Structure formats: C-alpha cells, structure tokens
Amino acid sequence: EAGEECDCGAPANPCCDAATCKLRPGAQCAEGLCCDQCRFMKEGTVCHRARGDDVDDYCNGISAGCPRNPFH
C-alpha cells in the first residue's frame, strides 16, 4: 500500500517494523525471491530455475524481486 516499505501483516518478519510498515534499520528488503536475511541477494544468483525451453532467471543485486530473463 502507499507509504509502506514492507508488509505489516507479519510481526515475526525480522526485516519489517510491523508498527510502521517500514524496513528496519540496515534492511534492504523484507521479502522476495532475491531477499535473504533482509539483504538483496548477489547479482547472478539464480532465483527461478528454467523449465522446458525456458531459461534461468537471476537476481540483479539491487532489488528483492526476481526479474525475468529478457531471453524468455
């Protein structure tokens, strides 16, 4: 939702302050396929394995989401 940096619904999330819906100090992310222990995963880390004719998707090191490989 507008103004939220993370989902307030899970008070057990160590990356998110459930009272403010903001990331805790030092956290880069709270969830996502490329978020590990509140930090963005390293660029080149596989976040979605290829199936069939598909190709692997990789973390970009600057976001928590798993961007689709442009060669799909």
UniProtKB/Swiss-Prot annotation:
GO molecular function: toxin activity
Keywords for this protein: Cell adhesion impairing toxin, Disulfide bond, Hemostasis impairing toxin, Platelet aggregation inhibiting toxin, Secreted, Toxin
GO biological process, one term: venom-mediated suppression of platelet aggregation
Tissues and organs where the protein is expressed, per its UniProt entry: Expressed by the venom gland.
Pfam families assigned: Disintegrin (PF00200)
Keyword Secreted: yes
Gene3D superfamilies named among the record's database cross-references: Disintegrin domain (4.10.70.10)
Subcellular location as annotated: Secreted
GO cellular component annotations of the record: extracellular region
Extra remark: The disintegrin belongs to the medium disintegrin subfamily.
Quaternary organization: Monomer.
Protein family per UniProt: Belongs to the venom metalloproteinase (M12B) family. P-II subfamily. P-IIa sub-subfamily.
Protein name according to UniProt: Disintegrin sasaimin
